[in-house]
Design a protein with these regions (language model features):
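Transmembrane beta-strands of outer-membrane beta-barrel pores
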Residues: 157, 174-178, 204-208, 245, ...
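N-terminal periplasmic "start-of-domain" segments of outer-membrane beta-barrel proteins
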Residues: 31-61, 89
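Extracytoplasmic beta-strand/coil segments of soluble accessory domains associated
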Residues: 71-108
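Residues on the lipid-exposed face of transmembrane beta-strands in outer-membrane beta-barrel proteins
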Residues: 186-190, 237-243, 285-291, 336-342
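Flexible loop and strand-edge segments within Gram-negative outer membrane beta-barrel domains
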Residues: 209-213, 224-234, 248-300, 305-332
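A beta-strand signature from Gram-negative outer-membrane beta-barrel systems
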Residues: 124-171
Length: 375
């Protein structure tokens, strides 16, 4: 009797297990049809690592100059000599600042005196994009000089863009901060015709550079002093004309920068004041023209003239601890470039570029060699 009940219960259990297993298998074996998803993307032609800041990201940065924005890139070393009024350079992959090419609207900035570009004099108020390459630019269609950089920084200024109901844009800003910083700026963009527009950007920077510090004297009392001769007066102005043509564009840019600044130094013989001064004037005028002649041939022309002036003064009559130095440097540069691109196949382009550059450097130093260079 007990054995019959046992086998009946065992049979019912096996039947229920088989029923549940078949039900589970039916759920697992059911088919669900999903609609197809098509993913499209452009082929990335950047074969060299690139980092870029543009648009809203650039405007939201708590930065004043291009050097401050480049701090957000990886793999770079920023050298800042003296805050707002000091020289600011960048070092990419430990190649040195002399091997970094800085390009403003596609044309390289030069310095025949020491080969170093001060990034602190380029403001972000009129900047559209800042791009950094760990080498040359990936594009094949570029001037010959662009192929010879161990590291490249491309600064792209704003190009006016207007809505249909707008013929001009005006942007005024005012910034202030510690150490007596006053920084107003104005940007005006005007639509001259359907294909021609103009822009004017001005900026003024002033700071006293004064701040308190503690000076300890051996065998005496600590003294609270104020750093002096750290003031900066800087004016930047640039204007541009922009034109659109069929399958191309042209643009012309004029840039002017003038500054006077003091150089504070160490406390020597209990003297807290330093009278070293420096005056800088930088001007350049450049033009670019680009046009595609069908799908086979493209032409790019660049031209530039630059003039740079530097005056450094250290007067021992005002500061006994210094040697008299009164040096002036004047340099000029002329640059011409022509790039040609021929498209043989969709996957094969040929670029032929030729550049010419003339540099001249003068100074008031004794036995100065007065270098000239044609490249």
């Amino acid at each position: 009797m007990f054995g019959q009940i046992y086998f009946r219960v065992l049979g019912i259990g096996c039947f229920l297990s088989m029923a549940l297993l078949s039900s589970a298998q039916s759920k697992l074996d059911s088919l669900h049809h999903l609609n197809e998803v098509v993913v499209t993307a452009r082929i990335n032609k950047e074969v060299i690592p690139v980092q870029s800041l543009s648009g809203d990201k650039l405007e939201k940065l708590a930065a004043h100059s291009v050097a401050d924005a480049i701090r957000y890139f990886s793999g770079v070393q920023i050298k800042d000599y003296g805050g707002i009024g000091g020289l600011k350079t960048v070092n990419i992959r430990s190649m040195g600042t002399n091997h970094v090419g800085v390009y403003y609207d596609g044309i390289e900035l030069g310095n025949a005196q020491n080969g170093v570009i001060d990034l602190g004099r380029f403001s972000l108020d009129n900047m559209e994009a800042v791009t950094l390459y760990n080498g040359q630019k990936s594009a094949i269609f570029q001037p010959a000089k662009d192929f010879g950089s161990a590291g490249s920084i491309y600064l792209q200024s704003r190009t006016p863009v207007f809505r249909e109901d707008r013929a001009y844009h005006v942007k005024a800003t005012f910034k202030t901060g510690s150490f007596g910083v006053v920084n107003p700026s104005l940007l005006w963009e005007q639509k001259l015709s359907e294909n021609v527009s103009a822009s004017l950007s001005t900026e003024y920077m002033y700071t006293t550079g004064k701040y308190k510090f503690t000076y300890a004297v051996d065998g005496g009392y600590d003294t609270t002093a104020v750093r002096r001769n750290g003031d900066v007066n800087a004016l930047r102005a640039e204007g541009g004309l922009y034109g659109k043509i069929k399958s191309g564009y042209w643009r012309t840019k004029a840039y002017f920068y003038n500054s006077e600044r003091g150089y504070p130094g160490a406390v020597v013989r209990n003297r807290f004041s330093h009278e070293d001064r420096q005056w800088d004037t930088n001007f350049f005028f450049q033009s670019s023209f680009k046009k595609d002649f069908g799908d086979v041939y493209s032409l790019l022309l660049n031209a530039k003239y630059a003039y740079d002036y530097l005056h450094y003064l250290a007067d021992p009559q005002k500061e006994e601890a210094t040697m008299y130095v009164n040096n002036t440097y004047r340099q000029q540069e002329v640059y011409l470039s022509m790039a040609n691109r021929v498209t043989l196949f969709p996957f094969w382009d040929i670029n032929i570029s030729a550049d010419y550059q003339w540099n001249k450097l003068n100074a008031n130093l004794t036995d100065f060699p007065y270098p000239r260079r044609n490249t």
